[in-house]
């Protein structure tokens, strides 16, 4: 969820100890931050799920725990507008996370858990943005909101005013999988270039409507 801020988990793995199928023990990268010597086999083993060997030890890089967060949810009329909102947020804010969900998913979550909708008006899509709750970021997020409204990218929005409200807004996104599991949906974790996401979403929607009317 926090890839925008922290990157992928693999980027935080400084070293691995691995047992291969032949019983050899490999010490990969030796916990070095900078290592330009030869092939970096560490990244071959990350995600290999045991096919190349058994990882029995990992050294992870740590960082300071994040400060309390401010969470925003914006209503968006078109999928393509989500990309523009993301660009504005990244250019003006230190974004921790950026997620989106559709109104169908939101309606299921709200109905199943008796949650409150983020605001009265409904939109086809919603953008959820998380940032650190600092004075500068909090002031800037209102500028982001105004800019997105002026450019007609969002129709409505809410900015959390407390930790409890921030958690409640996250629940709207995080509880989607739990809410939909008994419908037995087809689920995939697919990576798509940001520039191709609008086209991908449109193509998938047309394919689903054609095959599952």
Predicted segments with their positions:
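FAD-binding subdomain of flavoenzyme oxidoreductases
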Residues: 1-99
């Amino acid at each position: 969820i926090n890839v925008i801020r922290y990157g992928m988990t693999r980027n935080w793995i400084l070293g691995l100890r691995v047992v291969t199928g032949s019983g050899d023990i490999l010490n990969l990268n030796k916990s070095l931050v900078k290592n330009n010597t030869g092939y970096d086999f560490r990244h071959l083993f990350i995600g290999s799920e045991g096919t190349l060997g058994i990882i029995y030890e990992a050294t992870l890089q740590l960082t300071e725990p994040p400060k309390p967060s401010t969470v925003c949810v914006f209503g968006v009329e078109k999928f393509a507008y989500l990309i523009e909102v993301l660009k504005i947020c990244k250019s003006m804010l230190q974004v921790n996370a950026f997620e989106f969900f559709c109104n169908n998913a939101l309606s299921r979550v709200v109905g199943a858990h008796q949650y409150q909708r983020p605001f009265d008006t409904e939109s086809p899509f919603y953008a959820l943005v998380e940032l650190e709750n600092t004075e500068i970021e909090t002031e800037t997020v209102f500028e982001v909101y105004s800019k997105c409204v002026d450019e007609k990218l969002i129709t409505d929005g809410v900015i959390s005013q407390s930790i409890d409200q921030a958690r409640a807004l996250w629940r709207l996104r995080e509880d989607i999988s739990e809410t939909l599991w008994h419908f037995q949906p087809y689920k995939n974790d697919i990576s798509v270039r940001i520039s191709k996401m609008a086209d991908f979403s449109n193509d998938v929607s047309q394919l689903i409507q054609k095959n599952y009317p």
